[in-house]
Amino acid sequence: MTKTVSTSKKPRKQHSPEFRSEALKLAERIGVTAAARELSLYESQLYNWRSKQQNQQTSSERELEMSTEIARLKRQLAERDEELAILQKAATYFAKRLK
């Protein structure tokens, strides 16, 4: 759950990702102030954890949008390549007929 990291001043606790996730769920249900009091945390910790979680979700959404856009552009490029190949064959055919 938590482990203590020694520093010269005061030992710091590092909370596991599972603990952070559960703390954020609790904060959603009962509010940040009450959750912080119940879990013996600072409110700012919960706010920081929440903003980091939202940033991670936002970047995941961005990655999904980018991969969708990349797939669309690849399909479009393949269509253009096919059209170009057809036009080149037609140009070759008509060039031979004119001779």
From Swiss-Prot:
The keyword DNA-binding applies. GO terms for molecular function: DNA binding; transposase activity. The keyword Nucleotidyltransferase does not apply. GO terms for biological process: DNA transposition. Residues 1-21 are annotated as: Disordered. Keywords: DNA recombination, DNA-binding, Plasmid, Transposable element, Transposition. PANTHER family: PROTEIN DISTAL ANTENNA (PTHR33215), TRANSPOSASE INSE FOR INSERTION SEQUENCE IS3A-RELATED (PTHR33215:SF6). Involved in the transposition of the insertion sequence IS3. Belongs to the transposase 8 family. This is Transposase InsE for insertion sequence IS3. It comes from Escherichia coli O111:H-.
